[in-house]
Each structure stands twice: as structure tokens, then as C-alpha cells.
Regions:
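Conserved C-terminal guanine-recognition region of P-loop GTPase G domains, centered on the G4
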Residues: 123-137
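P-loop/Walker-type NTP enzyme "switch/lid" segment
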Residues: 4-14, 20-89, 93-97, 191
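Inter-motif core of Ras-like GTPase G domains
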Residues: 98-117
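Beta-strand-loop-alpha "switch" segments that mediate conformational coupling across diverse proteins
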Residues: 151, 163-196
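Charged phosphate-binding loop/patch that engages nucleotide di/tri-phosphates or the phosphate backbone
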Residues: 209-233
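Inter-lobe coupling/hinge region of RecA-like P-loop helicase motors
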Residues: 186-213
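Structural beta-sheet core signal
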Residues: 36, 89, 111, 145-147
Length: 233
């Protein structure tokens, strides 16, 4: 059965594309067939894909498509989604006419955030949209907030320390235990060198790989049916 994961944050969201690229690379490494859909007008995902093709670095097991309208997305899902093990969707975030159909098709929505008030509020908006769509359609799409571009300095800020109580206690959604740190390799990948999993393993790459594996393990746990509260315990 095809698993559908979307990255959504109505206020931008740090690292949506990078997060999905890393998750896709991990699933492809396992032997999965992964589709990625670029619905963001900035075309970051599609640019990475074409640049990787030009450098003969396109990863095996991954295909990337571009759809900018809800109709195009829904048609593609009906005709093609079942041919893939995972479908990962990079969204524009703010256009509800696009985001609502994406949520309606998703098993999990990930809202990446940097520790900023704007992005935390965007993640909360995304969670509320998931609840709204679930209620309207009788679905059980899950939602999680992922902290990205983390540094040692960021970890000492007041807002960083407030993220967990805000997200888990006040809002009531899931906060990933895995954090995505600010790493040069994540920037390098966007230059068309394929996925993280294709790179020669150095100490820096090994850290990023461990980080990504931990994230995907959490994703699999959520998709496997464990409640968010249970997994957070």
C-alpha cells in the first residue's frame, strides 16, 4: 500500500525540500520505489532533480514530478500513486486550495520549523488544517513538527526551549525527537549531487546519515499506528 507524506508549513517552513529529499533517499536505499511531487512555485525539488540528471547523479528508485494545481495533483495521484511505495509531496504551504487536497491524500504531514515564532505558528496552522480535513473526510492523517537547521547556539534560545511545551502540551501534536542540524552537506545536495545516501561516507556524512535514519524510524513508527502521545512518552 502506498504511503503518502507531505511537508507543509503555512509560514514557509525551514527545510521542507531537504527533509523530503533525505527521507526519499533512505526509502530508496531500502529498495522502495519513491515518487516526489514538487508543488512549490520555487521549484527547488525539480531543480535538484534536473541538476542531478545533468551531473549523472540521479538516484535509483526515485522519480520527481511537478504539479502546481490541485487538479493536476489529484489526477496524478489517481493514475500513478499505486505504482510507488512512497509518495512525498513538497508544498507551497500558504495556498489552501492546494494544501487541502494534499492533506486529504496524505498519511502523514510533517511541518518543519526553525525556532521562530512565525514558523511555529505556521506549524500550528498546518496541524489545525489536518484536524479539519480529518474531521470533514473521516480520515486519520497524522501530523508531526520537525525542528530543522538547529545549531548549538539555537539550542540556548528561549524560543527553542519553549517549542516542546507549546507543540506537545498546548497544541497537542507530535514533536519529532530527531532534530535536523544545520549541515553543509544539506546545502551541497541542492547543487545536484544526488541524495545524501549516495555520497562517500565521511565523518560529517555519517552524522547526517544517522540523523536521517533516526528521522525515518520515527516516521515509520507514526505510520505504523503508534499514537503520538504514546511515542512521545
Amino acid at each position: 500500500m502506498t504511503v503518502v507524506i507531505a511537508a507543509i508549513n503555512g509560514k514557509g517552513g525551514a527545510g521542507k525540500t531537504t527533509t523530503l529529499m533525505n527521507i526519499a533517499g533512505e526509502y530508496a536505499l531500502r529498495g522502495g520505489r519513491v515518487a516526489m511531487i514538487d508543488m512549490d512555485a520555487r521549484n527547488n525539488l525539480m531543480k535538484w532533480w534536473t541538476d542531478s540528471q545533468e551531473k549523472d547523479s540521479q538516484p535509483e528508485g526515485i522519480e520527481v514530478y511537478s504539479h502546481k494545481t490541485a487538479r493536476g495533483f489529484e489526477h496524478w495521484m489517481q493514475e500513478n500513486a499505486s505504482a510507488f511505495d512512497q509518495v512525498l509531496i513538497d508544498t507551497p504551504g500558504e495556498d489552501t486550495s492546494i494544501v487541502d487536497p494534499v492533506i486529504a491524500s496524505s498519511d502523514l504531514v510533517i511541518s518543519p520549523i526553525q525556532p521562530s515564532k512565525r514558523e511555529v505558528l505556521g506549524a500550528i496552522d498546518s496541524f489545525e488544517n489536518v484536524l479539519r480535513i480529518n474531521d470533514a473526510l473521516g480520515r486519520e492523517c497524522r501530523h508531526g513538527v520537525l525542528r530543522t537547521r538547529i545549531t548549538v547556539t539555537v539550542r540556548h534560545t528561549e524560543l527553542y526551549r519553549k517549542i516542546r511545551p507549546i507543540i506537545e502540551d498546548t497544541v497537542g501534536t507530535y514533536l519529532f525527537r530527531t532534530e535536523v542540524f544545520e549541515r553543509n552537506v544539506y546545502k551541497d545536495i541542492h547543487n545536484g549531487i544526488g541524495t545524501l545516501q549516495m555520497l562517500e561516507v565521511t565523518e560529517a556524512i555519517a552524522k547526517a546519515r544517522r540523523e536521517t535514519r533516526a528521522l525515518v524510524e520515527e516516521v515509520d513508527t507514526l505510520l505504523g499506528g503508534a499514537s503520538m502521545a504514546e511515542h512521545a512518552a
